[in-house]
């Protein structure tokens, strides 16, 4: 990768890391469900405008719309809700560390579902190291009562499973769809899925939204969804999907740094050591740095 692409990869990791900070801030003003709804709905409106203004031709079919529906659930609705509800009891920094297990879960699931994604020696080592990192973050002494006492952490770990299924589904069913079209379709379907629940159960909250919550939500949608997706498309076209794993390595440190600087939120020693172990696992999964030496 050239220096320009490295900057884009680092910037994407920073933007996605910022999503945990935005959730942390918005939880002070609105409900988790409303946070997710405003993020996907505002982002979808902006992306639809982009598609229209760019005069991108859409060849929609029932199958493609169905694929967008599934991707909306797996890549937006489920993980966004799980992370946002999880962050009610889990700090943004810790949430970003736990969410880094997405890559390990994707590798494991892909090896079971896809014929061309075998579990190589380096992948097995990377996944095992990643699992050790997650255990360190949770705390070995807390494992036995984890499901009962750490619901927020469980929700965030489950979000990684949803992202993993989404990555595999996209690889199989959306391979020939333009990334910007896929993102627009996915976010639009997410908005349509969530809208009935908003109208039925959150009508009072919609009416009570203030300028602060709307402003933060708009920033959240623009920075962490729209702008992030545009950079994602650029990386995908110019360097390939393989370099997106580097973003996964950058997200937790970015989230921790942003949360520490802006809201003074720090992680403990277990979480820090676990983070380093998880990053090591991701580097081994990526493989390129190991091959150099």
PLM feature spans:
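C-terminal transmembrane-helix exit sites in multi-pass transporters
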Residues: 49-55, 103-125, 253-272
